[in-house]
């Protein structure tokens, strides 16, 4: 590649990728790990998972972490975001620590650092320990106490070496999946519980931040949010209002309390009007107010487009946020034909400028961005390399908009692709591939670097393209 970079990034920019414990570790029932909701749900309803592939069959990072981390180094990573499996470290959610799990995470952290890769560590990535789900999960306030204890345990065990912590990844997703739209366990449709889950998750984040600061570990702590911009169909006031309400439900519900310490008035007004306020006390709001994040991870894949409701909602149907807006399919939109998602690269710029203008230009980074492709094997050449030019194009076009945001003063510090190697995408299992590295499940998880991985190495090494 000729090194006439048109897009130069700061020399200390964080280049890397992100992943989560349940999606890549494998070894779901080994070495003392307790069950989480994914292990349990797969056992109960394997037919709901693509090709009946469950969390025990994921990408075997548990056994191959040394080789995988060496590969990260080869692909130019200076940082990598992982998560700790709560039910691996503390099998029942509370109580005894699993020493083998502590050893594993210590080894992974040490190996990353030895390879010049800074570990970014997230505490919760959709994987509630089953023992806690049995008492209600995030609906039950006791889970908040258990989570704070888990967070303190992680800080104590790993905080000497880990200086970038995150309390949650996409906390709105377990709310949507578990309590509104039936794509996570416990598969309920119950808006009252959804609100309680959201509130307790937010409180748990603030309490972990408070604990981290009490422990004086001289790092930074934040949260990772999927900030999908809500674009209205038109400038008609009804469409604009639909966009603002969707934004309050899905973005500002966690963004505002995480960065500003308070919930958006538009959302609170709707919850009061509809009779869905959560149980809480004044001290909870004070803890949320005082314990805002140092650093924000931004996950961005696709925009959300909405319009004013076309029809009156069925009064007997369960209450869902969609009572206030309809999805809008914009004619002529650019699509990822392999995944059914819209590609709108400017969305990442819009998020960063919004954070700059309305959220104090908080220090942030792109913590996930990526392109899932079904049937990626058809792009493998004679040498066995997947020629994923579509992924290179996708990353490049997003990086151009991130670069523009930096030129305009955005405090964005890095870019992590989802994900390093193909991983298990929850109920979609291995249907859509996202990695820089392909994983062949038929050949014992054999790793092969894709064309995009080689390209990314060049970009990271030159901090630009």
Swiss-Prot record:
Gene Ontology CC: cytosol
EC number: 3.2.1.86
Pfam families membership: Glyco_hydro_1
Inducing stimuli: Up-regulated by konjac glucomannan and by cellobiose and mannobiose, the possible degradation products of glucomannan. Repressed by glucose via the carbon catabolite repression system. Also repressed by GmuR. Is not induced by aryl-beta-D-glucosides such as arbutin or salicin.
Family annotation (InterPro entries): Glyco_hydro_1, Glyco_hydro_1_AS, Glycoside_hydrolase_SF
Catalytic activity, reaction form: 6-phospho-beta-D-glucosyl-(1->4)-D-glucose + H2O = D-glucose 6-phosphate + D-glucose
Top-rank taxon, per record: Bacteria
Single Gene Ontology BP annotation: polysaccharide catabolic process
A GO molecular function held by the record: beta-glucosidase activity
Record keywords, A-Z: Carbohydrate metabolism, Glycosidase, Hydrolase, Polysaccharide degradation
Catalytic residues identified in the record: 170 (proton donor), 368 (nucleophile)
Family of the protein in this entry: Belongs to the glycosyl hydrolase 1 family.
PANTHER family per record: 6-PHOSPHO-BETA-GLUCOSIDASE GMUD, GLYCOSYL HYDROLASE
UniProt function note: Phospho-beta-D-glucosidase that seems to be involved in the degradation of glucomannan. Is also capable of hydrolyzing aryl-phospho-beta-D-glucosides, although very weakly, and plays only a minor role, if any, in the degradation of these substrates in vivo.
This protein's name: 6-phospho-beta-glucosidase GmuD
Organism: Bacillus subtilis (strain 168)
């Amino acid at each position: 590649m000729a090194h006439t970079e048109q897009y130069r990034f700061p020399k200390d920019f964080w280049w890397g990728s992100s992943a989560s414990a349940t999606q890549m570790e494998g070894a779901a029932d080994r070495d003392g790990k307790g069950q989480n909701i994914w292990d349990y749900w797969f056992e109960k309803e394997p037919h709901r998972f693509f090709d009946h592939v469950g969390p025990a069959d994921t990408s075997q990072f548990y056994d191959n972490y040394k080789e995988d981390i060496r590969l990260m180094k080869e692909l130019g990573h200076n940082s990598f975001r992982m998560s700790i499996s709560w039910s691996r470290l503390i099998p029942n959610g509370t109580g005894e620590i699993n020493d083998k799990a502590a050893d594993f995470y210590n080894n992974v952290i040490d190996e990353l650092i030895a390879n010049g890769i800074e570990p970014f560590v997230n505490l919760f990535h959709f994987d509630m320990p089953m023992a806690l789900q049995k008492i209600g999960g995030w609906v039950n306030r006791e889970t908040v106490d258990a989570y704070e204890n888990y967070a303190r345990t992680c800080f104590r065990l790993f905080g000497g070496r880990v200086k970038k912590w995150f309390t949650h990844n996409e906390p709105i997703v377990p709310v949507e999946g578990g309590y509104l739209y039936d794509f996570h366990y416990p598969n309920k449709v119950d808006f009252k519980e959804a609100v309680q889950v959201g509130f307790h998750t937010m409180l748990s984040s603030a309490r972990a931040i408070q604990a981290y600061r009490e422990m004086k570990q001289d790092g930074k702590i934040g949260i990772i949010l999927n900030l999908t911009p809500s674009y209205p169909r038109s400038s008609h006031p009804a469409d604009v209002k639909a966009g603002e309400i969707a934004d309050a439900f899905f973005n500002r519900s966690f963004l505002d309390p995480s960065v500003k310490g308070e919930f958006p008035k538009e959302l609170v007004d709707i919850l009061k009007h509809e009779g869905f306020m959560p149980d809480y006390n004044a001290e909870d709001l004070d803890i949320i107010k005082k314990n805002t994040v140092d650093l924000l991870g931004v996950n961005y894949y696709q925009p959300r487009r909405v319009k004013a409701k076309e029809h009156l909602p069925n009064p007997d149907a369960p209450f869902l946020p969609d009572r206030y807006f309809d999805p809008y399919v914009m004619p002529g939109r650019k699509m990822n034909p392999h995944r059914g998602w819209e590609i709108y690269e400017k969305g990442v710029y819009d998020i960063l400028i919004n954070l700059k203008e309305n959220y104090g230009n908080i220090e942030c980074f792109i913590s996930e961005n990526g392109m899932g492709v079904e049937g990626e094997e058809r792009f493998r050449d004679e040498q066995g390399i997947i020629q994923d030019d579509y992924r290179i194009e996708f990353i490049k076009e997003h990086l151009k908009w991130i670069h523009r945001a930096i030129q305009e003063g955005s405090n964005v510090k890095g870019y992590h692709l989802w994900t390093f190697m193909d991983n298990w995408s929850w109920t979609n299992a291995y249907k859509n591939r996202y990695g820089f590295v392909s994983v062949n499940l038929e050949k014992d998880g054999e790793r092969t670097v894709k064309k995009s991985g080689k390209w990314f190495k060049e970009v990271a090494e030159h901090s630009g393209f």
